[in-house]
A protein has these predicted regions:
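Acidic/histidine metal-binding catalytic segments
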Residues: 67, 108-119, 161-168
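Catalytic strand-loop-helix junctions within cyclic-nucleotide turnover domains
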Residues: 74-84, 118-138, 155-158
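Short gly/ser/thr-rich secondary-structure transition/capping motifs
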Residues: 1-6, 100-102
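A structural signal for short, well-ordered beta-strand segments
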Residues: 21, 71, 116-122, 203
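Alpha-helical scaffold within the catalytic cores of cyclic-nucleotide enzymes
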Residues: 46-61, 77-118, 143-154, 181-185
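Cytosolic regulatory/linker segments at or just downstream of nucleotide-handling modules
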Residues: 125-127, 154-213
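Helical mechanochemical/support elements of P-loop NTPase systems and associated helical scaffolds
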Residues: 41, 48, 67, 84, ...
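Catalytic NTP-binding/metal-coordinating core of nucleotidyl cyclase/transferase enzymes
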Residues: 9-90
Length: 213
C-alpha cells in the first residue's frame, strides 16, 4: 500500500501477475443495518474496517477497495512474493480471531455478535488503471478475483467463516513449511460449481473452534 502510494503518476501500464485475493464481509449486514440508526451503522463499519484493515496490513496485504461492509484485499502488490498465498490465509485466520475478540467486547456492551464470511483465491489477475483521464482508478480484475468473491458468498451455504479455493491451498503447500499448520485447519469439500462459472473448483472450508463462536 505504501509503495503504491509513492507513485506521483497513475500506473498507466496494464500488467498480469499472480496474486492472492481476499474478500471479507459481515454476514447478515443488510438486515442488521435496517434495525440500526444510520449513525450507529457508520460507527460499526468504521470499527469493523479498522480491525480488518489492521490484519491485512500486518500480513503484507493491500486494501484494493471498501464496498459497503465488504473489504477487497490483495496480496502480491506491487511485487509478487513466495509467501503471498500463505500471508492471505494467515490474514484470514487473524480476522477470525480478531472478530471473536471483538464479539467478546460487544457482549459486555449488550450488542449482538457479528459473523464474517471470507473468500480466498490465488492465481493470475490483470492490474492497472481503469476509467478516463478525468478519473482514473487503480484496480485488480480477472477470474481469480471473481472466484474469490463467489467463494465468499459460499460461506453462507457452508455455514463457515472461510472458503478457500484449491489454487491458494496448493500455493501454500508449495511455500514455506511454517505455513503448513494453516492447511491443517481446513477441510476438503471437493469440487463445487460457483454461480457465473462454467467449470467447478475444488474448495476448502474452515471449521470454527469453541472459542471462536
Amino acid at each position: 500500500m505504501e509503495i503504491l502510494a509513492e507513485h506521483d503518476q497513475p500506473l498507466g501500464d496494464v500488467r498480469r501477475q499472480t496474486v492472492a485475493v481476499l474478500f471479507v464481509d459481515i454476514v447478515g449486514f443488510t438486515r442488521m443495518a435496517e434495525r440500526m440508526a444510520p449513525e450507529a451503522v457508520v460507527t460499526m463499519l468504521r470499527q469493523f474496517h479498522q480491525r480488518i484493515t489492521a490484519q491485512i496490513f500486518a500480513c503484507g496485504g493491500t486494501v484494493e477497495k471498501y464496498i459497503g461492509d465488504a473489504v477487497f484485499a490483495v496480496f502480491g502488490l506491487p511485487n509478487v512474493g513466495p509467501d503471498d498465498a500463505a500471508n492471505a490465509l494467515r490474514c484470514a485466520e487473524l480476522m477470525i480471531s480478531t472478530v471473536a475478540e471483538w464479539n467478546s467486547e460487544r457482549s459486555w456492551e449488550g450488542e449482538s455478535p457479528l459473523a464474517i464470511g471470507i473468500g480466498l483465491n490465488y492465481g493470475p489477475a490483470v492490474i492497472g488503471d481503469v476509467g478516463c483521464e478525468q478519473g482514473l482508478s487503480f484496480t485488480v480484475i480477472g477470474d481469480t478475483v471473481n472466484t474469490a468473491h463467489r467463494l465468499q458468498a459460499l460461506t453462507r451455504s457452508f455455514e463457515t467463516p472461510l472458503v478457500v479455493g484449491d489454487p491458494l491451498v496448493g500455493a501454500v503447500k508449495m511455500g514455506p513449511s511454517s505455513a503448513a499448520p494453516l492447511i491443517d485447519r481446513l477441510q476438503d469439500r471437493g469440487e463445487q460449481f460457483l454461480r457465473g462459472r462454467t467449470g467447478a473448483i475444488r474448495i476448502w472450508t474452515r471449521t470454527l473452534g469453541n472459542a471462536e463462536t
